[in-house]
From Swiss-Prot:
Cofactor: [4Fe-4S] cluster; [2Fe-2S] cluster
Subunit structure: Homodimer.
Biological function: Catalyzes the conversion of dethiobiotin (DTB) to biotin by the insertion of a sulfur atom into dethiobiotin via a radical-based mechanism.
Alphabetically ordered keywords of this record: 2Fe-2S, 4Fe-4S, Biotin biosynthesis, Iron, Iron-sulfur, Metal-binding, S-adenosyl-L-methionine, Transferase
EC code: 2.8.1.6
InterPro entries found in the cross-reference section: Aldolase_TIM (IPR013785), BATS_dom (IPR010722), Biotin_synth/BioAB (IPR002684), Biotin_synthase (IPR024177), Elp3/MiaA/NifB-like_rSAM (IPR006638), rSAM (IPR007197)
Protein name: Biotin synthase
Pathway as given in its UniProt record: Cofactor biosynthesis; biotin biosynthesis; biotin from 7,8-diaminononanoate: step 2/2
Single annotated GO MF: biotin synthase activity
Length: 350
């Protein structure tokens, strides 16, 4: 097979034509590219932690963390450092190579940036890759996180530009693109994808992929989420998307962004093992690991490892911590046993 050429000039009709291929042809093309660019049996494993939950001012119609919807979600302040590090250690012990931290904000406040910078540094010291999703970032904020060593920043486009206004009205599509520009300019890696099953048309799924694939540099990681319908959100009663359309979206993402990690994100809890196996064959090679994604359910770790074993898959190996980092981590954990720390961070203490 000839070497895959990266493109940033995809036309909508080209991507729609990929979606329209017979399933066998689409899967063959996607898997061939996947096998050429990656170990087809390796899956990168990330753990996602909500470091600040609920009370978000945005009106994203899919999101239980919006303050505008009554979903029964209890809001929480920014987590204390030791709480985050305990979760990160647990994630590493369970086999995760990347630790992702998410906050329900429109954008981070300047008063919190020093604390977030320290959080990145502390998690990095455990020998893990780091990722954050905090909302919109200014160029200065992106540089601060990059200086701390943050590896990835997630900011999804969610859907096509045409359908976007039916999903969100409190932030523009361009503002999302601007944040991605700031992240890339800072030197961090970009994690950006979207959500399917929000009532969009097939052309909107093609439009989402087109926007991602036509970025000046493809996202390093492309999370594809299946809508998790949460009671109290405007999208709670939408019809289910045909699961095969989800597989098609994974396959087209793989074809158009051949060197990117394509992640199975939200919605896996409701997917059969057979559907997930098709997604891995179609080019997905990353998952979120653990029983919860921010506030929505996710398969248990043991279920994922059992599925990996049945499919002959293995997780990507994490970054090994140095001996000095291991000793520092153990010393900090031992010291923590002698004092009880608060569960939440107090910004006023800075």
């Amino acid at each position: 097979m000839p070497e895959v050429q990266l493109r940033n000039n995809w036309k909508r009709e080209e991507i729609e034509a990929l979606f329209a291929l017979p399933m066998n042809d689409l899967l063959f093309q996607a898997h061939s590219i996947h096998r050429q660019e990656f170990d087809p049996n390796e899956v990168q494993v990330s753990r996602l932690l909500s470091i600040k939950t609920g009370a978000c001012p945005e009106d994203c119609k899919y999101c239980p963390q919006s303050a505008r919807y009554d979903t029964g979600l209890e809001k929480e302040r920014l987590l204390a450092m030791e709480t985050v590090l305990t979760e990160a250690r647990s994630a590493k012990a369970a086999g995760a190579s990347r630790f992702c931290m998410g906050a329900a904000w429109r954008n981070p406040k300047e008063r919190d940036m020093p604390y977030l910078k320290t959080m990145v540094e502390e998690v990095k010291a455990l020998g893990m890759e780091t990722c954050m999703t905090l909302g919109m970032l200014s160029a200065e904020q992106a540089n601060t996180l990059a200086d701390a060593g943050l590896d990835y920043y997630n900011h999804n486009l969610d859907t096509s530009p045409e359908y976007y206004g039916d999903v969100i009205t409190t932030r523009t599509y361009q503002s999302r693109l601007d944040t991605l520009t700031n992240v890339r300019a800072s030197g961090m890696k970009v994690c950006s994808g979207g959500i399917v099953g929000m009532g969009e048309k097939a052309t909107d799924r093609a439009g989402l992929i087109q926007q991602l694939a036509n970025l000046e540099q493809h996202p390093d990681s492309v999370p594809i989420n299946m809508l998790v319908k949460v009671e109290g959100t405007p999208f709670e009663k939408l019809d289910d998307l045909d699961p095969l359309e989800f597989v098609r979206t994974i396959a087209v993402a793989r074809i158009t962004m051949p060197k990117s990690r394509v992640r199975l994100s939200a919605g896996r809890e409701n997917m059969s093992d057979e559907l997930q196996a098709m997604c891995f064959f179609a080019g997905a090679n990353s998952i979120f690991y653990g029983c919860k994604l921010l506030t929505t359910p996710n398969p248990e770790e043991n279920d994922d490892m059992s599925l990996f074993k049945r499919l002959g898959l293995h997780p990507e190996q994490g970054i090994a911590a140095t001996k000095e980092q291991d000793e520092a981590m153990l010393a900090k954990a031992a010291a923590h046993q002698d004092k009880k720390s608060a569960a939440f961070y107090d910004a006023g203490a800075l």
